[in-house]
Amino acid sequence: MFHLDFVTNWINKFLQKYLIDGWVLLVEFVLIAFVILIAYAVLALLLIYLERKVCAFFQCRLGPTRVGPWGIFQSVADMIKILLKELIRINKVDVCLFHLATYIVIIASICTFGAIPFDKGLHVVDFNIGVFYLLSVSSIGVVGILLAGWASNNKYTIIGAIRSGAQLISYELSCGLSLMTVVMLSGSLQLSSIVEQQSCGWNIVRGGIPAIIAFIIYLIAGHAETNRGPFDLPEAESELTAGYHTEYSGIQFGFFYLAEYLNMFIIAAIATTLFLGGWMPLHIPGWNLFNEVMDFIPSILWFFVKTFICIFLALWVRWTMPRLRIDQLLNLEWKILMPISLINIILMAFWIIYL
């Protein structure tokens, strides 16, 4: 199978040939930061365009068509517009926390993004506690949201921030329990190790019914963590104007907007990594010719195809389901998803021991 690890190995050997160790490390850090930021921005623009087209499809429209062929540059035009907008200074806000909140949200998203293994050797960090790292770092974003609501000194932003905090903290529990079933099945917390163990079968297949239940719960809880419909109560326009980022404008609003789309990608990428084999191809036992053909497809392409299928499911849910009330949203977590997740961990233990 074709992997991209030879590219990173070649760059490392090339730098070691001409630079001392300290400079090699510095240059590699700069290159990694540059690539992450470029990939972050490009993925956000792509996801915005994809959502507009998917939304148009479900509403029997065409979507963006004017800027560039098939409207592909509409997201770029919108990005330029938002960068040129004025940063409006609001009276009676906590200036330090008001500005800090935007950076906390975006940094939490970038740190999580950097830990995702896109291909063999194509990840920034590969901790031996990778699953715990993802859960902990991705949870930092809620601090930025709470600060944004509080610092704005606005009743709508405070209500939106409190809703978002309650929602994220609640659904984080189901997310974590779902991922623990994969850890039990794989026997490892390291993301690259979990992916490589799926070379003989994806976890969603190897884990049977408990893995399927965990996958479904993770998709629901992960979608709720992104604050997107039908779980978009923190940004309910009819009640809270724009929720916790009502008072933000220009690039500061763009940071929240950017983080929302990248969080959607991160949730789908984690689902792909832990449940759908990551960069591993689809293999069917006994179908040797089919398996050989699948091996010719580049591994990074497998990763992105699976990830974008999960993203399409999230967009499908968003544009077809009505918004939940706050009591329905919390009842779904505490009375349905949480008990099922706890029972599912016991089921996975029995599956591992007896099957």
Curated annotation (Swiss-Prot):
It catalyses: a quinone + NADH + 5 H(+)(in) = a quinol + NAD(+) + 4 H(+)(out). PROSITE patterns: COMPLEX1_ND1_1, COMPLEX1_ND1_2. It is a multi-pass membrane protein. Its EC number is 7.1.1.-. One of its GO terms (molecular function) is quinone binding. Signal peptide: none annotated. This is NADH-quinone oxidoreductase subunit H. The lineage of its organism: Bacteria, Pseudomonadati, Bacteroidota, Bacteroidia, Bacteroidales. The gene is nuoH.
